[in-house]
Amino acid sequence: MMVKKILITGASGFIGGILVEHLSKNSNYDVYGIDKHIGLSSRYQLENTSTSEGQQPILPPKEKFYVCDITDRNQLLHIIQDNQINIIIHLAAVLDAETVEKINYINCDGTKILFDIATQQDHVEMIIYASSGLTVAGYFENEPYSSLIKNIIQKEPFKKLTINDPPIPSHVNPSREAYCNSKIYGEQLARQYSSSDGINVKFVCARFGWINTADTITMDSFNSDWCSHRDLCQFIDRVLENQLKLKRFQIYFVTSNTDFCWLDTGNCREDLNYVPQDGARWNQLLTKM
């Protein structure tokens, strides 16, 4: 099997570090990374997760890591071409704590620049785009999903959202709405490129659930879309293993197996044989209290 060269954007980030560490253990992959900054993700502080003194992000070897802004077209082009990258895992993005302008610039403009460059290279085979379960966060503004925010457990089963349900962004605040819309835009862009003549790059849009720094789930039904670090890595493994079988464009919800999860991962199981290894039952969470 030919060694695949994988480029991870946002490699210095929280999820980037998980995937760099995981994929680097596989001799079938040669892992590269780019990020605008080098430093421990702000997610640890935002989520009050303790870290050891001087803890640093897990990065590829220095000769395979580049300090690069995702909007720097020229540098990005050289990195992808010079290293003959085969697969791109696009994680680079700013969170909804930023301004609307910055979210649009990095998450939308940066993604378009990356897709533009990647789809013009014969050696690029696939892009795994880190979308988000927040693409459908607007459903929480209506029942039965709004009850989940209040931790009101439904007596009757409710319909899980599938990839066929139209995206609806959250309207909680302008930044959250901009973040949701930026992920919806990225998916639309991927669909557009995948249907264009002369482009052979496959696009997988992964609507990841709630991946937290502590890698634990709390008794909060709003967070029932939790995805463990182990299941995140399993999903990426399954996509890479099934690359040849995949359609040119696909969307997947990616979560662990938790009670009251409102996202349907059925096509993920059918296409990729993805079976979550982690999760929690509601009565187990109650017992721990």
Whereabouts are the PLM-identified features?
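NAD(P)H-binding glycine-rich loop region in Rossmannoid oxidoreductase-like domains
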Residues: V67-I106
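Alpha-helical substrate-binding/gating segment
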Residues: R207-A214, W226-R248, N257
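N-terminal Rossmann NAD(P)H-binding glycine-rich loop of SDR-like oxidoreductase domains
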Residues: I6-N26
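Glycine-rich NAD(P)-binding loop of the Rossmann-fold in SDR/ketoreductase-type enzymes
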Residues: T71, K102-I113, N181-I184, C227
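Conserved Rossmann-fold NAD(P)-dependent oxidoreductase catalytic core, especially the SDR/UDP-sugar
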Residues: I113-N173
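Rossmann-fold cofactor-recognition segment
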Residues: Q56-D72
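Conserved C-terminal active-site "lid" loop/helix of NAD(P)H-dependent oxidoreductases
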Residues: R248-V275
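Active-site Tyr-X1-5-Lys
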Residues: N151-K202
